[in-house]
């Protein structure tokens, strides 16, 4: 029998926020602006990066974002999952 997941919506929201904080921290450490990162992953506006980093308007990074951001920042995608 397969175990049911015990993560609540609040748990998942905390995970999204942690990932956003980690992306922001690493981006800032690398000296890359939100605009430059947005353009590097194929977006024309900082809104996607800004909202996802702060988990605003129910926005969060998806796996495609994270793969592209890791590539642009030159880090391993697992670095975004620290402290989860």
Language model region names:
Residues 22, 33, 62-65, 76:
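Residues that mark the N-terminal boundary/hinge immediately upstream of a DNA-recognition element
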Residues 23, 37-38, 49-53, 80:
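Conserved hydrophobic/aromatic packing and binding residues within compact polymer-binding modules
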Residues 42-59:
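Recognition helix of helix-turn-helix/homeodomain-like DNA-binding domains
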Residues 36-39, 69:
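Short alpha-helical "recognition helix" segments of helix-turn-helix
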Residues 29, 40, 72:
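Residues within the alpha-helical elements of helix-turn-helix
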Residues 2-29:
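A short, Lys/Arg-rich alpha-helix, primarily the initiator
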Residues 63, 72-84:
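Short C-terminal boundary/hinge segments that cap the last helix of small helical domains
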Residues 31, 56-71:
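Short, basic-rich loop-to-helix N-cap that marks the start of a DNA-contacting helix
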């Amino acid at each position: 029998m397969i175990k049911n997941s015990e993560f609540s919506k609040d748990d998942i929201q905390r995970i999204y926020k942690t990932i956003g904080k980690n992306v922001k921290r690493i981006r800032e450490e690398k000296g890359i602006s939100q605009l430059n990162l947005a353009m590097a992953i194929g977006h024309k506006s900082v809104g996607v990066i800004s909202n996802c980093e702060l988990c605003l308007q129910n926005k969060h990074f998806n796996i495609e974002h994270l793969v592209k951001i890791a590539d642009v920042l030159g880090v391993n995608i697992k670095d975004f999952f620290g402290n989860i």
